[in-house]
C-alpha cells in the first residue's frame, strides 16, 4: 500500500501540535477491506448502528467506517465522524463508474470537486446539479489532500492511470449509455458514484 501521507508518513499541515485524525469512508465492506488490513485497529466503536474502527497508520489516527450506500448514509456517517471522533479530514474511497474515456477498470480518479448529478430543479430555472438557496453546489476537495493523494499514487508500484477530475454523485446506479451522457452533459462528471458529493 502506498503511504497515504507521502514519504513523510504523516499528514503535515504546519500545525504539528497534535496527531491528525483522518476519517475514511467506504460505502461497502469491499471498499475498506484492504485498508482494514493495513491500519493497526485499536478499538471498534458502534455509533448509530455503524462500526467505526479506530486505529493508527503512519503516525496518523485513523477512523475507518462502512457508511452504507447512498448520499444520506454518507452524510450521516460523515457527521458522526466529525461529532463523535473529531476528525480533521474525511476521505471517501470506493468504486465508481467511468464517464471519462481516459479511465479504465482499476484506474484511479482523485477528486477535485464533487456535485450531485441527481439534484434537478431545472423546472424552476436552475441548472441540473444546483442546490437551491445554497451558495455552493460543486464542493471542492482540499488542495493539500489532493497533493498528498497524487504523491501517494506516484509512490505506488501498481500499474494504473491516475487522473484528477470531478465526482458526480447520485442515488442511482448508472447502467446505461443515456445515463452516462446525461451526467457528462449537465455536470461534466469524470466518474459517477453514490456518496462523494454528500461527504
Predicted regions: what they are:
Residues 3-10, 15:
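Short, positively charged and aromatic/hydrophobic N-terminal segments
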Residues 19-79:
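N-terminal short beta-loop-beta anion/metal-coordinating cradle
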Residues 31, 37-43, 83-84, 104-115:
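A glycine- and small-aliphatic-rich helix-loop capping segment at beta-alpha/alpha-beta transitions
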Residues 99-187:
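Mid-sequence, gly/pro-rich, charge-dense loop/helix-turn segments that line enzyme active sites
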Residues 193-199:
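Short glycine-rich, acidic/polar surface loops and turns
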Amino acid at each position: 500500500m502506498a503511504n497515504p501521507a507521502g514519504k513523510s508518513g504523516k499528514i503535515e499541515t504546519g500545525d504539528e501540535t497534535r496527531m491528525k485524525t483522518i476519517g475514511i469512508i467506504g460505502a461497502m465492506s469491499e471498499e475498506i477491506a484492504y485498508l482494514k488490513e493495513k491500519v493497526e485497529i485499536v478499538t471498534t466503536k458502534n455509533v448509530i448502528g455503524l462500526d467505526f474502527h479506530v486505529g493508527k497508520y503512519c503516525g496518523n489516527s485513523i477512523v475507518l467506517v462502512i457508511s452504507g450506500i447512498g448520499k444520506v448514509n454518507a452524510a450521516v456517517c460523515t457527521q458522526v465522524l466529525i461529532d463523535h471522533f473529531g476528525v480533521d479530514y474525511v476521505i471517501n474511497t470506493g468504486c465508481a463508474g467511468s464517464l471519462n474515456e481516459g479511465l479504465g477498470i482499476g484506474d484511479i480518479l482523485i477528486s477535485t470537486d464533487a456535485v450531485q448529478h441527481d439534484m434537478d430543479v431545472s423546472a424552476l430555472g436552475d441548472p441540473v446539479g444546483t442546490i437551491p438557496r445554497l451558495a455552493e453546489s460543486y464542493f471542492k476537495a482540499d488542495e493539500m489532500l489532493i497533493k498528498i493523494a497524487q504523491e501517494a499514487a506516484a509512490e505506488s508500484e501498481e500499474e494504473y492511470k491516475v487522473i484528477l477530475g470531478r465526482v458526480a454523485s447520485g442515488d442511482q446506479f448508472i447502467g446505461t449509455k443515456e445515463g452516462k451522457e446525461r451526467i457528462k452533459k449537465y455536470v461534466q462528471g469524470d466518474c459517477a458514484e453514490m456518496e462523494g458529493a454528500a461527504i
